[in-house]
């Protein structure tokens, strides 16, 4: 829940030869000379490829990838969809998304032939969390947001399937009475929160559920959110109100808005949940501002990004109460095994 009211794997690992279809389009290089565009990274006239900075790439495979990318850049949306369909890849999305998807497919195929992948690129599981919290119309600066819905969607990164879900409502204690605006926005009723446990009890249930999935022990995992606010604001405020330290497993996470913007090269204004879905050719499924439904839709975006070749990895953390970015140059790391945090003194 961000503070903005009004997000089949391509390629066959066993494939022995990278597909080398031709693009029918011809591009004039000069009045006398024309060059056919091929998706095998080679030029039909045998001329030497030079990188944009004037020097050769060190490995021929990167020349092939660059040539393929150039051809893809010149394809129409219909040609992109036809080529994606040929390889049984997802054909929905805006043109820039389709280009990125096809480029990553060819890149993965070519690099797979060059050398086998070394090491773990992905987490075994991603836990998608999108809190719903108490709110008032206009969100006054002094208002203390309390978590009233704690959902978790467990995404298996190997099968790209939602393996399980967790959902619990939470009883607020500072502002026990929900505003009409909050009820209308989230669909959560006063009766539902009145009958719910307080946050410490719900957090304990979440941790027990995560432990039952062997997260952080048998399986490498991390948290993923739609924006920074869920972990850096809502959970942080709630832990202070409940006199708990911030849970160690929730101190680092993937902000999918940041990952989406960086991967598809779009501005932050284009990374709201509904816009991300739209650009990927999907509709929102469920009730907006239901924490569980939001989390499921965020998971759908994560799946599509993984299919398109994005390496989702931790990119934000909270340290000393401050939100900080995590450099992509650091080694991939998972969240620690979930433990109930100690009480604050």
UniProtKB/Swiss-Prot annotation:
Mg(2+) 2 binds at residues 130, 230. Residues 72-106 form the SAP domain. Binds 2 magnesium ions per subunit. Residues 126-302 form the Exonuclease domain. Its main location: cytoplasm. The modification Phosphoserine is found at residues 55, 58. It holds the Pfam family RNase_T. The keyword Phosphoprotein applies. Residues 1-50 are annotated as: Disordered. Mg(2+) 1 binds at residues 130, 132, 294. It comes from Mus musculus (Mouse). RNA exonuclease that binds to the 3'-end of histone mRNAs and degrades them, suggesting that it plays an essential role in histone mRNA decay after replication. A 2' and 3'-hydroxyl groups at the last nucleotide of the histone 3'-end is required for efficient 3'-end histone mRNA exonuclease activity and degradation of RNA substrates. Also able to degrade the 3'-overhangs of short interfering RNAs (siRNAs) in vitro, suggesting a possible role as regulator of RNA interference (RNAi). Required for binding the 5'-ACCCA-3' sequence present in stem-loop structure. Able to bind other mRNAs. It catalyses: Exonucleolytic cleavage in the 3'- to 5'-direction to yield nucleoside 5'-phosphates. Widely expressed with high levels in spleen, thymus and testis (at protein level). This is 3'-5' exoribonuclease 1. Signal peptide: none annotated. Keywords: Cytoplasm, Exonuclease, Hydrolase, Magnesium, Metal-binding, Nuclease, Nucleus, Phosphoprotein, RNA-binding, RNA-mediated gene silencing, rRNA processing. GO terms for biological process: regulatory ncRNA-mediated gene silencing; rRNA 3'-end processing. GO terms for molecular function: 3'-5' exonuclease activity; 3'-5'-RNA exonuclease activity; histone pre-mRNA stem-loop binding; metal ion binding; ribosome binding; rRNA binding. Its cofactor is Mg(2+). Its EC number is 3.1.13.1. It is found in: Cytoplasm; Nucleus; Nucleus, Nucleolus. The keyword Isomerase does not apply. Disruption phenotype: High neonatal mortality rate. Reduced body size in surviving mice which is observed as early as embryonic day 15.5 and remains significant in adults. Knockout mice show brachydactyly, platyspondyly, and no obvious changes in the epimetaphyseal regions of the long tubular bones. The gene is Eri1. Although it can bind simultaneously with SLBP to the 3'-end of histone mRNA, the presence of SLBP prevents the exonuclease activity. InterPro entries: 3-5_Exoribonuclease (IPR051274), ERI-1_3'hExo-like (IPR047201), Exonuclease_RNaseT/DNA_pol3 (IPR013520), RNaseH-like_sf (IPR012337), RNaseH_sf (IPR036397), SAP_dom (IPR003034), SAP_dom_sf (IPR036361).
């Amino acid at each position: 829940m961000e503070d903005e009211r009004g997000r089949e794997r391509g390629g066959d690992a066993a494939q022995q030869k990278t597909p080398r279809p031709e693009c029918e389009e011809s591009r004039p290089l000069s009045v006398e000379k024309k060059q056919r565009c091929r998706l095998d990274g080679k030029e039909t006239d045998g001329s030497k490829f030079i990188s944009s900075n004037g020097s050769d790439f060190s490995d021929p495979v990167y020349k092939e990838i660059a040539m393929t990318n150039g051809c893809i850049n010149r394809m129409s949306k219909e040609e992109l969809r036809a080529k994606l369909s040929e390889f049984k890849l997802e054909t929905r999305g805006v043109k820039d998304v389709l280009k990125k998807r096809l480029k990553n497919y060819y890149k993965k195929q070519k690099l797979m032939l060059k050398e086998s992948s070394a090491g773990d690129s992905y987490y075994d599981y991603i836990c998608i969390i999108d809190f719903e919290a108490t709110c008032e119309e206009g969100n006054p600066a002094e208002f203390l947001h309390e978590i009233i819905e704690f959902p978790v969607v467990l995404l298996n990164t190997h099968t790209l399937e939602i393996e399980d879900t967790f959902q619990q409502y939470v009883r607020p204690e500072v502002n026990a009475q929900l505003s009409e605006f909050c009820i209308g926005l989230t669909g959560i009723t006063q009766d539902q929160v009145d009958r719910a446990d307080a946050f410490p009890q719900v957090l304990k249930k979440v941790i027990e559920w995560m432990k039952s999935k062997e997260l952080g022990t048998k399986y490498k995992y991390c948290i993923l959110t739609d924006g920074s606010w869920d972990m850096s604001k809502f959970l942080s405020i709630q832990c202070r109100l409940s006199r708990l330290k911030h849970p160690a497993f929730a101190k680092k996470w993937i902000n999918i808005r940041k990952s989406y913007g960086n991967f598809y090269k779009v501005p932050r204004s284009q990374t709201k949940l509904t816009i991300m879905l739209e650009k990927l050719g999907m509709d929102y499924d469920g009730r907006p501002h239901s924490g569980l439904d939001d989390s499921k839709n965020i998971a759908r975006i994560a799946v599509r990004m993984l299919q398109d070749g994005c390496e989702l990895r931790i990119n934000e953390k909270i340290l000393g109460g401050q939100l900080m970015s995590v450099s992509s140059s650091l080694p991939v790391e998972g969240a620690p095994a979930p433990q109930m945090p100690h009480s604050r003194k």
